[in-house]
Amino acid sequence: MKSFIIFSGLIFVIFLSNKYSCQPVADNQYLSSLSENVKVLEQRMYPAMSASSANEEKRFQLEIFGSMAKAEEQRSRYPNPLFFHSWKDTED
């Protein structure tokens, strides 16, 4: 068992020291999150589908940010939703 662990560790070290596995890819950039890694992988695997999914994602983000902007606008109209009724009554 001990020799198996040493042997597998040796193979692992050889694999890590392999110059081809350590070479950076030309377009390798720092990716800050897993979702960006997934997007890059999908673009490389399915280039035709990634273009259409990018358009769908942009549309989805516009919908989300549009609804968030509307919600923020509504929030800015009223100081605190918990005290909305008492606040409205004091202005009348």
Swiss-Prot record:
Residues 1-22 form the signal peptide. Keywords: Secreted, Signal. It is found in: Secreted. It comes from Lychas mucronatus (Chinese swimming scorpion). GO terms for cellular component: extracellular region. This is Venom protein 49.1. Expressed by the venom gland. Belongs to the non-disulfide-bridged peptide (NDBP) superfamily. The keyword Magnesium does not apply.
